[in-house]
């Protein structure tokens, strides 16, 4: 018999395995661990519960969490509360799709491959680029991979990054760069945008590329046309990290001449989930096609002339070239990419534009309300769905108070930047109502 209900190994199985490897007992397997630190007591566990009782207890624990179903969320900074069409979960739950792994066998994976191909097509169209890959882990790693590509392509070992790029993405880039012996220089932010004069001074012959966020971490829309001219005059690459939803209204980076556009498609069909897993995207111009990291799905025809989909240009990848690959990314976020594809397809072009417009309109309404109530709102009105409000109290204290009123407050900018202590980054998406926005502004009156 098995010793444990959920472990199929019997005592005889255990004995046979120990005999094969030449030890007498399970304890002998752990002889390298000093005796004094081995756990030998009984586990102090509560008595077993029935499944209904266990579900009740877990539900009670889960109810302690603040969620965006019952709370009005104004928290963004890279992860947002957006409308997710009901059909998304139905499609991604199908057994044919329910994997995050790469479909290596095209003959049995046409549905999955076509779904990825559609994701690539929609991302390329949104960003205004020639092609996109099948997805990355998230926006931060996609940005870092873009910088590695720029360095490899230009044979230069220095990357410039705007101080208005999300600090976490910037930190991911610095981590990647350390292993590749690439220098990263941060161009300071000025009034919520990249300091253009500082960028001009920093550009030199050893700069592989410049990274900018559009809209940036503070919600501001960067002047890509001006930045593109400066960067390309230096024969460097322009790398843009973008919120794909904003591109329903804003001019795509590709139309400004961006070389690489990356970001996170969490805004389409993927819940916040405490920060992940999400889905990065990576789009480039044709000249960089053979240096793209990750999978690429291409459309072809079989011997009968029927349309089919396959993984293409695989010679770039680590399972083929090992240490000479363009990147060490192996799998991708296929399931989350599918969720984004279904969400975008469900919205359609008109729906996506409407969703973006609601973000723009509602966030500008909120900013207007803050100003009417006498709050100091920073920077220009050129933003998409996030802006910065200065308060008189610590943001952590304010947010704890807001929770009591059923509101999830904005992001504490002082966490990363001392000069922005008591400054809140407010995100307003299409999910927020006029009543919720008004209540949020009213709740902050005491912290004005």
UniProtKB/Swiss-Prot annotation:
Catalytic activity field: N(6)-[(R)-lipoyl]-L-lysyl-[glycine-cleavage complex H protein] + glycine + H(+) = N(6)-[(R)-S(8)-aminomethyldihydrolipoyl]-L-lysyl-[glycine-cleavage complex H protein] + CO2
Keyword NADP: no
Covalent S-S links between cysteines: none
SUPFAM superfamilies: PLP-dependent transferases (SSF53383)
Protein's GO biological process: glycine decarboxylation via glycine cleavage system; nucleoside metabolic process
Keyword Mitochondrion: no
Entry's EC annotation: 1.4.4.2
GO molecular function: glycine dehydrogenase (decarboxylating) activity
Subunit structure and binding partners: The glycine cleavage system is composed of four proteins: P, T, L and H. In this organism, the P 'protein' is a heterodimer of two subunits.
Family membership noted in the UniProt record: Belongs to the GcvP family. N-terminal subunit subfamily.
Described purpose of this protein according to its UniProt entry: The glycine cleavage system catalyzes the degradation of glycine. The P protein binds the alpha-amino group of glycine through its pyridoxal phosphate cofactor; CO(2) is released and the remaining methylamine moiety is then transferred to the lipoamide cofactor of the H protein.
Name the UniProt record assigns to this protein: Probable glycine dehydrogenase (decarboxylating) subunit 1
Organism of provenance: Listeria monocytogenes serotype 4b (strain F2365)
Encoding gene (name): gcvPA
